[in-house]
């Protein structure tokens, strides 16, 4: 019942501040401006990745924990999506988390039901991480995980997180659900699963570009096997990286 309240946001403490944007009543003008600007930036990031924007999610933003939880959110989360309804927590009021959830809606809108149903969860999340550019899931964070020996999924393990259930179990197993406790202790937060997915998808998306990504989606919609189509794109990525490295002049250390 809680997510259903998003269908009537103005009846449950939210006010419309722009097209498809609702914000918890009582928010100051700075927060309103920040959210409107985040909407523009998030849309721009979706367009850059997909070449255009076909989805139009409705954004619901909370400035209090009570508001977020009243719509079905949980304390440790920054954002979540219910169909085409994005819910932002007080910790997720920026373009990064808005773009992340928007990417889920965009790819769901572009895929037919069969293709969407067969798309692995790691891929959906990895695309969203790469597009949203959140510092918490960046290559810098990936290197931090390596340098500090934080447990993280291997590539083979990551590619096995196909269902939402498998994904959420991995997120819990690798400690991403304990970040509030880490923060309270003054310890750095870790996000090995989401960051691993972004690490896998960044070079793949960069090599394909928006046109190649759209061709990939078309092939899935035509009924081609996901793993085969992804592997073809990943082979192109590996060739691109190898060629780029060969093009760099060699330098000797003094």
Predicted regions and their residues:
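N-terminal functional modules and adjacent low-complexity/disordered segments of proteins
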Residues: 2-3, 108, 163
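Surface-exposed aromatic
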Residues: 84-88, 125, 198
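N-terminal low-structure segments adjacent to metalloprotease catalytic domains
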Residues: 1-15, 246-254
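Short charge-dense sequence patches
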Residues: 1, 48-56, 75-84, 143-152, ...
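Juxtacatalytic substrate-recognition/specificity segment
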Residues: 6-120, 134, 226
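Acidic/His/Gly-enriched intrinsically disordered linker/tail segments
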Residues: 97, 115-197, 206-254
């Amino acid at each position: 019942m809680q997510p259903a309240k998003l269908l009537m946001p103005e009846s449950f403490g939210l006010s419309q501040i722009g097209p498809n944007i609702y914000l918890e009543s009582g928010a100051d003008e700075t927060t309103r401006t920040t959210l409107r600007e985040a909407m523009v930036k998030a849309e721009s990031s979706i367009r850059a990745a997909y070449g255009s924007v076909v989805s139009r999610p409705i954004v619901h933003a909370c400035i209090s924990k009570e508001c977020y939880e009243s719509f079905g959110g949980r304390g440790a989360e920054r954002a979540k999506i219910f169909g085409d309804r994005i819910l932002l927590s007080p910790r997720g009021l920026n373009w990064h988390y808005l773009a992340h959830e928007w990417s889920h809606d965009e790819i769901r809108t572009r895929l037919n039901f069969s293709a969407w149903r067969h798309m692995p969860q790691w891929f959906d999340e990895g695309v969203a991480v790469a597009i949203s550019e959140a510092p918490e899931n960046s290559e810098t964070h990936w290197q931090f995980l390596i340098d500090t020996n934080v447990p993280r999924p291997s590539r083979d393990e990551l590619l096995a997180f196909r269902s939402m259930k498998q994904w959420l179990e991995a997120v819990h197993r690798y400690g991403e659900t304990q970040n509030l406790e880490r923060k309270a202790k003054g310890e750095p937060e870790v996000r090995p699963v989401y960051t691993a997915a972004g690490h896998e998808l960044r070079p793949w998306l960069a090599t394909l570009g928006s046109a190649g990504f759209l061709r990939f989606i078309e092939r899935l919609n035509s009924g081609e096997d996901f793993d085969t189509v992804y592997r073809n794109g990943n082979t192109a990525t590996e060739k691109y990286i190898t060629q780029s490295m060969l093009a760099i002049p060699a330098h000797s250390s003094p």
